């Protein structure tokens, strides 16, 4: 496993379905998210957008940056013909959940994970 961030980024974008979107302020990266377009065998939502790793620098939270990023993600998802946008959020992040609900998202599923490598 390669823990070099540059190699991780290159692997992430290699298939062309995932983008890393970075928000900049005064020449400094202050926010980011990953957007992956998923093509599924699902009659109701054959193309979905998966958002992951939404981050805003702590001292800049509450200034609308996160909301602007999520609007950007929606615009990109629609441009890719996605009919649904989804993401996961740690169950302990109540403030983040309320933020997403204010943006119109609904909690619809329970998430499950399984480590495939020993840690």
Feature annotation, model-predicted:
Residues 22, 28-37, 55:
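Conserved beta-strand in the GNAT
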Residues 38-40, 56-59, 92-94, 117:
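Short coil/turn motifs at secondary-structure junctions
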Residues 40-51, 61, 108:
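A conserved beta-turn-beta hairpin within the catalytic core of GNAT-like acetyltransferases
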Residues 70, 77-89:
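Conserved GNAT acetyl-CoA-binding A-motif
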Residues 86-96, 113-118:
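Conserved beta-strand-loop-alpha-helix junction that forms the acyl-donor binding cleft
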Residues 100-110:
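Conserved acetyl-CoA-binding loop of GNAT-fold acetyltransferases
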């Amino acid at each position: 496993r390669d823990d070099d961030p540059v190699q991780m980024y290159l692997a992430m974008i290699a298939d062309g379905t995932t983008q890393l979107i970075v928000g900049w302020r005064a020449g400094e990266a202050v926010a980011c998210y990953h957007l992956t377009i998923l093509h599924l065998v699902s009659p109701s939502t054959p193309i979905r957008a998966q958002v992951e790793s939404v981050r805003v620098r702590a001292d800049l939270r509450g200034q609308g940056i996160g909301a602007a990023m999520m609007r950007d993600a929606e615009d990109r998802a629609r441009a890719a013909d996605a009919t649904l946008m989804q993401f996961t959020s740690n169950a302990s992040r109540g403030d983040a959940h309320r933020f997403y609900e204010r943006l119109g998202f609904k909690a619809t599923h329970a998430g499950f994970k399984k480590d495939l490598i020993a840690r």
